[in-house]
């Protein structure tokens, strides 16, 4: 029985699961939004939020601890230089999960997971502003 077991197995071995979430955490931090299944998004939130909490205070110990988990210097640099200062005053809830329908092949529920205070790219801003102009003109 799986009473009081924390986490999802996701039908894979523990080494594979750890590798999946390490890569997904790197992708989320670098891109600030990714699309994945709902179960993986919920598990990824449990991994990424403590990382962001550690990155709010820039110490050598925190850098080494995060490097032992991620093993990617580019991601560590972005965490401490950009993401940590953005979330400094926020006490939790750094990610948002948005459901986005079902996958075509197997109807698995899909979701976007994104950082809450992410910086939107100029292409997205243009799209949003053009939609607002169309609504105002009607």
UniProtKB/Swiss-Prot annotation:
The keyword Ribosomal protein applies. Keywords: Ribonucleoprotein, Ribosomal protein. One of its GO terms (molecular function) is structural constituent of ribosome. GO terms for cellular component: cytosolic large ribosomal subunit. GO terms for biological process: translation. Gene3D superfamilies: Ribosomal protein L17. Pfam families: Ribosomal_L17. The keyword Nucleotide-binding does not apply. Part of the 50S ribosomal subunit. Contacts protein L32. Belongs to the bacterial ribosomal protein bL17 family. This is Large ribosomal subunit protein bL17. It comes from Buchnera aphidicola subsp. Schizaphis graminum (strain Sg). The gene is rplQ.
């Amino acid at each position: 029985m799986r009473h009081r077991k924390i986490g999802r197995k996701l039908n894979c071995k523990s080494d594979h699961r750890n590798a999946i979430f390490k890569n997904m955490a790197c992708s989320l931090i670098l891109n600030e939004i990714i699309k994945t299944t709902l179960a993986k998004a919920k598990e990824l939130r449990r991994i990424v939020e403590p990382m962001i909490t550690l990155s709010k205070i820039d110490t050598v110990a925190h850098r080494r601890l995060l490097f032992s988990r991620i093993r990617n210097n580019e991601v560590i640099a972005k965490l401490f230089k950009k993401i940590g200062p953005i979330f400094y005053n926020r006490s939790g809830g750094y990610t948002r999960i948005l459901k986005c329908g079902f996958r075509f092949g197997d109807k698995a529920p899909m979701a976007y997971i994104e950082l809450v205070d992410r910086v939107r790219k100029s292409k997205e801003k243009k799209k949003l502003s053009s939609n607002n102009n169309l609504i105002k003109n009607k």
